[in-house]
Amino acid sequence: MPRRRSVEPRKILPDPKFGSELLAKFINVLMVDGKKSTAESIIYGALETLSQRTGKEALEAFEAALENVRPTVEVKSRRVGGSTYQVPVEVRPARRNALAMRWIVEAARKRGDKSMALRLANELSDAADNKGTAVKKREDVHRMAEANKAFAHYRW
């Protein structure tokens, strides 16, 4: 952490097919071992399947799914006088997106479908319908924050 001024976050180039920075970030989250073209083909295949299934435009359906998974509050551990409290804090917008993308990719990887593109399409479809593993994860995080609302005054 620099002392003088805050570091500007790097600008990410939009993805080549849809021109979306959000989708480019999602491609980077999905990418394994630097294989970006593989990640792109998986995502574009999943989005094609998703748009056929929902009847919406691919990017619109993707953003709807992401919106349903984004958390608004989370808990952070805070040590006060020898005991650790789970303190609910609001999630910054950039972290909301990052967590949502990570949870969707994790949930898709755990699914038992044939190809990764199909697994991702199914998870995005479920997320758009407000169900699925990624949405359940968000609900769990929100429930945890709600349960620990009494410790909100320990925020820093």
Swiss-Prot record:
GO terms for biological process: translation. It comes from the Bacteria. One of the primary rRNA binding proteins, it binds directly to 16S rRNA where it nucleates assembly of the head domain of the 30S subunit. Is located at the subunit interface close to the decoding center, probably blocks exit of the E-site tRNA. One of its GO terms (molecular function) is tRNA binding. This is Small ribosomal subunit protein uS7. Keywords: Ribonucleoprotein, Ribosomal protein, RNA-binding, rRNA-binding, tRNA-binding. It comes from Haemophilus ducreyi (strain 35000HP / ATCC 700724). NCBIfam families: rpsG_bact. Belongs to the universal ribosomal protein uS7 family. PANTHER family: RIBOSOMAL PROTEIN S7. GO terms for cellular component: small ribosomal subunit. The gene is rpsG. Part of the 30S ribosomal subunit. Contacts proteins S9 and S11.
